UniProtKB/Swiss-Prot annotation:
It comes from Xenopus tropicalis (Western clawed frog). Residues 62-69 are annotated as: Leucine-zipper. Probable regulator of creb1 transcriptional activity which is involved in adipose cells differentiation. May also play a regulatory role in the cell cycle. The lineage of its organism: Eukaryota, Metazoa, Chordata, Craniata, Vertebrata. Signal peptide: none annotated. This is cAMP-responsive element-binding protein-like 2.
Length: 118
């Protein structure tokens, strides 16, 4: 026997390897392809919606932080002039610990931040 046709005691048959190609219904194959493309587009749409929402929420967070920074800058400028802002006095005296910073944030928004953050 020829060494190329014998491996491990088994005789190889000449011919094609693997599964025999079945007669594939071309219409069914085309429909599966279309369905797969539809699903792919739907997944892509969901992914982009998620990313847009994520960007939007991050932009809102950035605006809120800019507003807070502006508020603190105003407080620092007032203290540099020797004035103590009423909000800081309220915080130091313990009056409305939760209400004072929120009120100041709204005032800071009305000054310069409307132009920067939509």
């Amino acid at each position: 026997m020829d060494d190329s046709k014998v491996s491990g005691g088994k005789v190889k048959k000449p011919g094609k390897r693997g599964r025999k190609p079945a007669k594939i219904d071309l219409k069914a194959k085309l429909e599966r392809s279309r369905q797969s493309a539809r699903e792919c587009r739907a997944r892509k749409k969901l992914r982009y919606q998620y990313l847009e929402e994520l960007v939007s929420s991050r932009e809102r967070a950035i605006c809120a932080l800019r507003e807070e920074l502006e508020m603190y800058k105003q407080w620092c400028a007032a203290m540099d002039q020797g004035k103590i802002p009423s909000e800081i006095k309220a915080l130091l005296s313990g009056e409305d610990l939760k209400a004072a910073p929120n009120q100041v944030k709204h005032r800071a928004v009305k000054t310069e931040q409307k132009e920067k953050c939509p």
